[in-house]
Regions:
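Non-catalytic, mostly N-terminal accessory regions of nucleic-acid modification and defense proteins
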Residues: 1-218, 277-286, 291
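Conserved Class I SAM-dependent methyltransferase catalytic core
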Residues: 14, 21, 30-43, 210, ...
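Aromatic-residue hotspot detector
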Residues: 40, 48, 81, 232, ...
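A generic secondary-structure signal for well-formed alpha-helical elements
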Residues: 42-55, 189, 240, 244, ...
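Gly-rich Lys/Arg/Thr-decorated short loops/hinges at beta-loop-alpha junctions or inter-strand turns
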Residues: 188-191, 320-326
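Conserved S-adenosyl-L-methionine
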Residues: 196-306, 311-318, 326-328, 339-340, ...
């Protein structure tokens, strides 16, 4: 426990310095996954360490063997993510072959490979993380001029996170501070990427307007078919809280085509203390195949909100649930799939449901099949 709580400004400054460490080695589009991954590892380990200390105090009367059995049983940790030995920040371990493995904070060589093993271990120990980490974050990949990042750079980044705050809620100025800091990182990388950053981030002011139009309420199901980093779903829950409701009494659903962005979204939900929502974020092409199903068909929701990718192509022969597009099919080529997203959103509404979306102005004026769909 620290005397002075960590403020959002302090945590943002800390994360800025993380980016500085990597900035000289590669473009921001290449290193964003590394900072997201490192932050996630540190947060999970810090939470785990806190729960582990509580278990040790609670069971201090037991023998060493009995206590260790409890400490290594992931069922002992309740809602806290279980961090296996391979992924622990502060504690090394000796394996069955009597080989000692350093804690993350003490990594010195083959660091990219070791960090990948840590990610894989924590994913394999927590079902909700299946497919999120090891398939989408690769600390050992080549960047820039086809070179792997040097151990010295990884060591600097690890040392920076090790010198920073312990990332547990009790140390935060407000409960959702880490989630807010994660949103700050997402905006930082979107701004750095310029126009391309729009694939995973929509400005907060725009999201806020859409959410105010939708007016989500407790007990509803809210869906974003092009979820990106998840900001629209998160703001929907926050809106309910601002209206005096319980943000955990809204079910959030999303789907994202890009693998790394999908992983960023799932981690975003977890860092906003909403693991249920993380489990409801699917990875896949929404136009081709909506993955949220109910009674053998695509699921319907009380509220649908999205900023679909503008001007995309699609392949009609691959499309499932064609009944979603009752107004007609837009051209497959020429980057004119915008009204396909609109129709999917309409088809995904429950009776008396409401949707809000962002579209390029071309959908209002283009002729051909798009004109027929509008009519």
């Amino acid at each position: 426990m620290i005397k002075n709580k960590i403020s959002l400004t302090q945590l943002e400054s800390f994360l800025d310095k993380s980016a500085v460490i990597l900035r000289g080695s590669m473009d921001s589009s290449e290193y964003k996954e590394f900072i997201f991954g490192m932050l996630f590892l540190k947060r999970m380990s810090d939470q785990f360490d806190k729960k582990r200390e509580e278990l040790m105090k609670k069971n201090s009367h037991l023998s060493k063997e009995e206590l260790n059995e409890i400490l290594e049983d992931k069922n002992s940790y309740g809602d806290t993510f279980f961090v296996p030995k391979r992924a622990r920040w502060n504690i090394g371990f000796t394996d069955k072959e009597s080989v000692f493995h350093s804690a993350i904070k003490d990594y010195k060589q083959n660091i990219g490979e070791e960090l990948n093993k840590a990610l894989a271990a924590i994913e394999e120990s927590n079902d909700i993380l299946e497919g999120i980490l090891k398939s989408n974050i690769n600390f050992n990949k080549t960047t820039g001029k086809n070179q792997k990042i040097k151990d010295s750079v990884w060591k600097d980044l690890i040392d920076h996170f090790n010198s920073g705050p312990i990332l547990i809620n009790e140390n935060f100025e407000f409960p959702d501070l880490l989630g807010a800091a994660y949103e700050y990182l997402i905006k930082y990388f979107a701004d750095s990427a310029g126009k391309k950053g729009g694939e995973f981030y929509t400005p907060n002011e725009v999201v806020r307007l859409l959410v105010q139009i939708l007016k989500p309420k407790e007990g509803m199901e809210v869906y974003d078919p092009c979820v990106g980093s998840g900001g629209m779903l998160i703001q929907s829950a926050q809106y309910i809280e601002e209206q005096g409701g319980d943000p955990h009494r809204v079910a959030l659903f999303g789907q994202e085509k890009a693998g790394t962005v999908w992983a960023i979204c799932a981690m975003n939900m977890i860092l906003h203390n909403n693991s249920d929502a993380a489990a409801n974020i699917e990875h896949g092409d929404t136009i081709i195949n909506p993955l949220h199903k109910h009674n053998g068909t695509y699921r319907k929701f009380h509220r649908v909100i999205a900023n679909p990718p503008f001007s995309q192509n699609y392949n009609r022969s691959e499309v499932k649930f064609e009944q979603r597009f009752s107004y007609g099919f837009a051209p497959e080529t020429g980057k004119k799939a915008d009204l396909m997203f609109v129709q999917h959103m309409i088809a995904s509404l429950k009776d008396k449901g409401v949707m809000a979306t962002i579209m390029p102005h071309g959908v209002l004026f283009r002729g051909g099949r798009e004109k027929l769909i509008r009519e």
